[in-house]
UniProtKB/Swiss-Prot annotation:
GO cellular component entries: cytosol; small ribosomal subunit
Keyword tags: Ribonucleoprotein, Ribosomal protein, RNA-binding, rRNA-binding, tRNA-binding
UniProt cross-references to PROSITE patterns, sorted A to Z: RIBOSOMAL_S13_2
Transmembrane helix is among the record's keywords: no
Protein name listed in UniProt: Small ribosomal subunit protein uS13
Upper lineage: Bacteria, Pseudomonadati, Pseudomonadota, Alphaproteobacteria, Hyphomicrobiales
Region: Disordered, residue numbers: 92-122
Length: 122
C-alpha cells in the first residue's frame, strides 16, 4: 500500500482512481498528475515502481494543495468571512445555508433536527 500525502492509497486500483482518495484531488487533477509523471492510465498502484511513487509524491507536494493544508485554508477562508462580518460569514455563524437556498421549509441538513415549539398547534 503506497502512502502519498499522508494517505494510504489502495494498491489494487488504477492510479487515477487511487489518487482520488487524497482530499483535494479529483478526477481531473488525478489525470493531470499521471500525465505529468508519464504513467499510463491503465497502470495499477501495485505495478508502480518506487521511483514513480516518489515522482507522484513530489508532483503533489510541489503543485497541489491537499489534505490538511487544503482543509486549513478552507477553514481560514470561512473564518475570514465571519471576522469581516460579510453576509456569507453571518450565514456561516448562524449555521444557515450560505448560497441563497430557501430556509422556510428546507435546509434541514444545515439547520439540524426540527425543534418543537410549545403551543404551536393548529
Amino acid at each position: 500500500m503506497a502512502r502519498i500525502a499522508g494517505v494510504n492509497i489502495p494498491t489494487n486500483k488504477r492510479v487515477v482512481i487511487a489518487l482520488q482518495y487524497i482530499h483535494g484531488i479529483g478526477a481531473k487533477k488525478a489525470e493531470e498528475i499521471t500525465q505529468k509523471v508519464n504513467i499510463p492510465a491503465e497502470r495499477r498502484v501495485n505495478q508502480l515502481t518506487d521511483a514513480e511513487v516518489l515522482q507522484i509524491r513530489e508532483t503533489i507536494d510541489r503543485d497541489y494543495l491537499v489534505e490538511g493544508d487544503l482543509r486549513r485554508e478552507v477553514s481560514m477562508n470561512i473564518k475570514r468571512l465571519m471576522d469581516l462580518g460579510a453576509y456569507r460569514g453571518l450565514r456561516h455563524r448562524k449555521q444557515l445555508p450560505v448560497r441563497g437556498q430557501r430556509t422556510h421549509t428546507n435546509a434541514r441538513t444545515r439547520k439540524g433536527k426540527a425543534k418543537p415549539i410549545a403551543g404551536k398547534k393548529k
